[in-house]
UniProtKB/Swiss-Prot annotation:
This is Peptidyl-prolyl cis-trans isomerase 9. InterPro entries: Cyclophilin-like_dom_sf, Cyclophilin-type_PPIase_CS, Cyclophilin-type_PPIase_dom, Cyclophilin_A-like, WD40/YVTN_repeat-like_dom_sf, WD40_repeat_dom_sf, WD40_rpt. WD repeats lie at residues 45-83, 88-127, 177-216. The modification Phosphoserine is found at S13. Keywords: Isomerase, Nucleus, Phosphoprotein, Repeat, Rotamase, WD repeat. The lineage of its organism: Eukaryota, Fungi, Dikarya, Ascomycota, Taphrinomycotina. It holds the Pfam family WD40. Belongs to the cyclophilin-type PPIase family. CDD domains: cyclophilin_WD40 (cd01927). One of its GO terms (cellular component) is nucleus. The gene is cyp9. PPIases accelerate the folding of proteins. It catalyzes the cis-trans isomerization of proline imidic peptide bonds in oligopeptides. Its main location: nucleus. Its EC number is 5.2.1.8.
Amino acid sequence: MMDGASPVDRDVSPVGLPKKRIKQNHDQVFLHNLPDAPRYTKSYMHNAEIYKCFPTKSNYILSVSYDGYVKFWHKTPNGVEYIKEFHAHNAMLLSAELSQDERLFITGADDKSLKVFDVESIDLVNIIDLEFLPKAICCFNSPSLKTSLIAVSSAESPLIFFFESGGDGEVLYTVKKHTAPVHCLRYLSTLDCFLSIDIGGMVEYWSPEEPFQKPDTAELFNMKSQTDLYIFKKQKSVPTSLEVSHFENFWSTISYPDCKVRVFDTKSGRAILELDENPSNAAKKVEALFEKEDTESSYYMSHVELGRRIAIERDIEKHGLTVGTTAIFDESEKYLLYGSIVGIKVVSIDNGTVVRIYGKDEAVRFTRLSLYQQAPKKSNLPSLDVIASNNPLVEESFQKDPTLFATAWKKQRFYLFSNMSTKFTLSDRDVYNEQVLPVTNNEGRQENGNILLGKAAIIHTTQGDISIKLYPEEAPKAVQNFTTHAENGYYDNTIFHRIIKNFMIQGGDPLGDGTGGESIWKKDFEDEISPNLKHDRPFTVSMANSGPNTNGSQFFITTDLTPWLDGKHTIFARAYAGLDVVHRIEQGETDKYDRPLEPTKIINISIVYT
């Protein structure tokens, strides 16, 4: 004790020992700043599959879809309100990103252009024409360069080009740090350096100034050999995305084909957390839970549902770098959030435990995530009188409204997870803010008035994909009916309800028992018997019926020669790939009524128009 200290400064505990400092556990506080609703509370539409949502601290939400549309929304306590939209590109979107200060939003498309938006004024402020296809975009303010720059990697070379955000499109300088195109690019303001990953899995740290080397600072690792930055090369896997935490202490990746989620310490370059999300491991967990009859586990699901989800995971893995599944951090840097086969997991970075799961019971696979942890209502300069007024409206304006924004695999909606206090019902949470059309207006579709005819289709099932060639010239009505039903999701999650070995597999009934289904015209339509098409080979796709001119929605795929069906059933397609999938479905066990004991589900059907 210091000389002259008063008795009140002394430790006067009865045991005569110093009091232990109580270590406060803030985990519950940090979790309180995350949404607590297990299911999504709202969803909103675009007319095409959505790339990502970008929430800002100024309460603007930006959503962008692959057809080049950018929508501005305003965050409200009960969701979002639409403000304005731009048709930024008449081409397929390739990349989009917010600037670090959230003032600018940049999009890039395969029309070889960048569009620059001012977020606060909600306006398109610049167009930059490129001589290359853009890949990754990063808009940053470097203290050493004292200006706002846009870094854009080329999809065709390892080069990264730098432009002024408000400039005339002149290339300021070019950097080559990789031997393959760079698809992940982030600027670390705390270190004034870039973090980049190429499509070969190589990771680099480098300064935005010449000679573009790793910053010479004691905060960073000395040699790359001391880090885990070669891990993707060693595992022969490539990250699909790169996310940096709020204070830039960590960064995360999701890589394929090893299906690993990793968290790295920024300064040491070491992997501090590795999570295995391989679908085969999930299948093993489900089997073990079935044996234990553990229905409380997050991995518990039926075999049919497991098959459906594994098929989606394999589809995502097959598309690789184009998926861009993300693993994001909360603002406290305590938790990592990412989509998985069982929903969106919230994982503790300290020990890797799953503390929360969102969307386990939803039928979609969530991919790109973004987190809003602000208060949707703000008073610019509240007075002391206002703060002390105990007015519930004032209190509400200062309350945080944590909201998780998620896009989903092959979906035209973005989804909001918020708090349980948000009132919603499952029947009205999906907002139809766009006109629901039979088919979205993508390039390459055959249009004749309102008639839309596909050239081919891919039937995504829980056993795998079946590709079929359509015959719009021979059976235009049957193809139109099948195409429109597929695009509208009519066949989604239906089953192959009737299986007869050495004959056929039948599906297309939303009731799942062979008694339901109707055409897009709400009535039976006539047969289209073509002399050019016969049931003279297996894998012929025909309309099921109950007599002449009674076609609805059901169809079947033959597995052998069936000449007795000629003249009785409309042939509108033939399978040309995934024939093994057809055989696997055919070989499934059935009851005496030809109903499968473990039905194969149709996840959805993709239509090809070119």
